[in-house]
Amino acid sequence: MELCNQNNHITAVSGDPLNWNATAEALKGSHLDEVKRMVKEYRKEAVKLGGETLTIGQVAAVARGGGGSTVELAEEARAGVKASSEWVMESMNRGTDSYGVTTGFGATSHRRTKQGGALQNELIRFLNAGIFGPGAGDTSHTLPKPTTRAAMLVRVNTLLQGYSGIRFEILEAITKLLNHEITPCLPLRGTITASGDLVPLSYIAGLLTGRPNSKAVGPSGETLTASEAFKLAGVSSFFELQPKEGLALVNGTAVGSGLASTVLFDANILAVLSEVMSAMFAEVMQGKPEFTDHLTHKLKHHPGQIEAAAIMEHILDGSSYVKEAQLLHEMDPLQKPKQDRYALRTSPQWLGPQIEVIRAATKMIEREINSVNDNPLIDVSRNKALHGGNFQGTPIGVAMDNSRLAIASIGKLMFAQFSELVNDFYNNGLPSNLSGGRNPSLDYGFKGAEIAMASYCSELQFLANPVTNHVQSAEQHNQDVNSLGLISSRKTAEAVDILKLMSTTYLVALCQAVDLRHLEENLKKAVKSAVSQVAKRVLTVGANGELHPSRFTERDVLQVVDREYVFSYADDPCSLTYPLMQKLRHILVDHALADPEREANSATSVFHKIGAFEAELKLLLPKEVERVRVEYEEGTSAIANRIKECRSYPLYRFVRDELNTELLTGENVRSPGEEFDKVFLAISDGKLIDPLLECLKEWNGAPVSIC
C-alpha cells in the first residue's frame, strides 16, 4: 500500500485501505527470485533506515555483524521523530494525562505522577527482571549476540517513523553501538512479546541510561561496563530519559521480530537447498524424471508446488544421470518399480506448501519489522495520543509456529530420502550404508549418520508443536492474551539449526552417492571387459582357434553383468556365495542344457568349459577390480564423473573441492562427523549460498514448456 505522510499523519492514497493488495503484490514473482533479492540485500555494505523499507536480508546482515554492514539513519526522519518527542513534553507541561507518561503501567495505570523522568527510570528498573546465571561468561541464559543486534536494528527502524515520542539522539546512540560491534547483554527468557518484549528491551535502555547492572559485549567478545561500552562507541554521555522515552524503548516487538528475521533468512535458503537436493536424490537414485512434468503440477494449481517441480525439472533437464537411467529403464523395465517411492515422486507436492508457508511468514515478519508497534502512539497531526495494542506480537508467534511446522516437514522429507539412499534394498545398486571401502564387513559407512538423522528428525518433529497455544495470563490479568512471539522465534531458531544438521548430513551423503556411482560405472566397465575376454578365450575359441556356436553365450554372460549390481559382489567378485558367479554359472548351464547334441562333443561342450571359465575369471577379475579402485583413488579413472555434466555439480564441487571432503570409507581414519562439521560450518556461515544459486543460474523462472 502506498502511504502519504503529511504532518506526521499517514493516509492511504492507493485505494488499498486494508493493505490486502499490497500484501498480494509482495508475493509476485518466484520464491527463488525473492531469495536472490534477500541475498543481495544481505551483502550490501550499508543499511539505511527510514522506518518502512527494512528487509529480512538487511536484518540478517546487521545481526551477524563482522563489520560487513554499517547502519545509517535517514536524515529526513529526524523531523518526524523530533516532532513526536516535543509533543510529549508539551503535553506533559500542559498537564495532559497520558499513559506511561503521567500514569503507572499496565494493570496499575490508575496511579498518577508528575515526575515523568523518574517514572521512566523506574520502568527500566523493574523490567530488569531477567536472569543471566553465573556471570557474563555464561551464555546459556543470555540472548545470542546476533539476536540482540537484530532487535536493536528493528527497534531503531520502528522509532524512526516518529510516532513514539523519543529523541533522535537516542536512536543515533543505538546506531553507534551497532556500528562499533558493541552489544548489550539481554536475558534469553522473560518476555511474552505483549506488551512487546519488555524485559529484554529494558536492558538496552539500561545500557543507554548507564544502569550499574548493565553489561555489554565488545567486538572481540570482551565484557564491557556501560561506561566502557559508551566510550568505545563514541557516545559522550548516558541519557537522562524524558517522559515516554523508556516506554518507547521497551514497548515493542523488536526482539521477537528481529530473531524471526534471521531465522527466516536461513529458512528460505534451506528451502531452496531442499529442492535442489531432492533433484540430486533423483539423479543418484536413477529416478524417473517424469515426476517433474509441468502438466502434473499445473493441474494441482499450487504455486509452491509448481515452482518446486520446475526447479527440480531444471536440475534434471540434460542430467547425465537421467540420460543413463533412462537407458537402464529401457533395457530392463522390470528391474525397478514402475513408479519411484513417495519421497522422490511427490517431493514437489510435499515441499511446495512448506515453501508457501515460509514465504508468507517472511512477508508477515517483513511487515512487522517496518511497523510502529508500541503504545501509546503519538499522532502529532491530530494532537492526540492513541492507546492501542500494536505491541501484541501475534504476527510473530503465528508466523514462527507456521514456519516451524514447515521446517519440520522439510526435515521429514530429507530423512525419508536419506533412509532410502543408505538402504541397499531401495537405492538401486548403491552399497548398504553407502559404504565406500573394499571390505563391507569392516566399513559401515553412514550407519551412525542414519542414527543421528533419526535423532535430528525426532527432535525437529517435537519442535513442530505450537508455542502460541500455551499462553498464560500475565501482569495481574492485564496481559491476559499474549503472543509468545520471542519464545516461538527461539524454538524456530532451534528448528532451523537442526535442519542445518540434517541438510549437512544429507548433502554429504548425496556426494558420497555421486562418488559411488562414479566408482560403480568404472567397476562395471572393468568387470564386463574381464568377463568378455575370458568368454572369448574359453567359450568361443577352440584349441585350434576355430569359432564354436557357444560364442553366442558371450552376449548372455555380459547381460548378467549388466543386470547385476556391481556392489553386490565387488568386495569378492569371484565368490560363489555372491550372485555374479552364481548367475554366470547358471547361464552357462542353461546353454548346455538347451543343446544336448552340442554338449555330446567335448570340443563344443559349454558344460565342460565352465570350470576353465571360472578359473580364468578368478585369476583376472579380482586384479581388474583392484586396478579400478586404485585408479579411482588416484583420480585417474577411465570414465569421468558424470556429476560434472549436471546442473547440480556446483554443490558437489563445493563440498568436495572447496571444503576438501572425500569419499568416506572404513579404510581411512577420518570419521563422518569430521566431514559433516566442515559442511555445517559452511552452511551456517552462508558459504553454501553461491554454489546453491549457481545450480539455478540458468533457470528462467518457468517450467519446461509442455507444448
From Swiss-Prot:
One Gene Ontology CC term in the entry: cytoplasm
Taxonomy, superkingdom: Eukaryota
Protein's UniProt name: Phenylalanine ammonia-lyase 4
Temperature dependence: Optimum temperature is 46-48 degrees Celsius.
pH note: Optimum pH is 8.4-8.8.
Cited Pfam families: Lyase_aromatic (PF00221)
Organism field: Arabidopsis thaliana
Subunit structure: Homotetramer.
